[in-house]
Amino acid sequence: RAQREFPGQPIDVVGHSFGGCAAGLGASGHLIRRLVTVGAQFAYWRDYAPEHRWRMFAKWHVLMPLVTMICGYFPGKRLGWLEDTPAGVVRDWSLSTARYEKRSSGRAISTTSGQMPFAGVTAQTLAISISDDPYGTVPAIERLLGYFTGSTNSHLRIHPEDIGEEEVGHFAFFRSPYQATLWPIALAWLQHGELAPDTPGRRVPRG
């Protein structure tokens, strides 16, 4: 749609959490010029931060699918836990597999297109992870980046103290208190395809 409504304009994308994964699943991923992902992974439980792993496993991979099985969908609004979510989506999220193509959505995409579409993305890609994000650990971020074989990928790891904070976590990057410290990192990448010299954090070495 963006290409149709704004012909000739570059298409840049920012994706948080599964949104970063979704950027590589669309048929139009090859149109993306630059991509910034924040805490982007696909919830493989062994990649969760060790100190939170079993609590998170119980919440997302046991309790959530159990409630969904009982109710026929996940009543997130009523529980104050996310939004109401279809049963098929919950089953896909909660499946404990290290390979995306083994999930039901991954199998469906592979059956339709013959391959996983991540490799079609050729964007300059910056994956940002925060050290106190129990979902976006280095293994989790790298697991997803490994699917983007057609793009040039950089992984920036930021500690809260790098920006004078005690905590940031998984959900706070795009909240207004971080407008002056974190948002410019994403903006610089979208505008120039590179990090400014004074960017907080460190690049994660990639094999």
Each model region followed by its residue ranges:
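Conserved acidic catalytic loop of the alpha/beta-hydrolase fold
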Residues: 1-10
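Alpha/beta-hydrolase-fold enzymes
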Residues: 14-103
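Short, conserved loop/helix-junction motifs that constitute active-site signature segments
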Residues: 29-30, 118-122, 147-150
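Active-site nucleophile elbow and catalytic-triad environment of alpha/beta-hydrolase enzymes
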Residues: 96-117
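Short beta-strand/loop motif that positions the catalytic acidic residue
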Residues: 121, 127-129
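Short alpha-helix in the alpha/beta-hydrolase fold that links the catalytic acid
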Residues: 123, 136-147
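Acidic beta-to-alpha connecting loop that harbors the catalytic carboxylate
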Residues: 131-133, 171
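Catalytic active-site module of serine/aspartate enzymes centered on a nucleophile-bearing elbow/loop
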Residues: 157-207
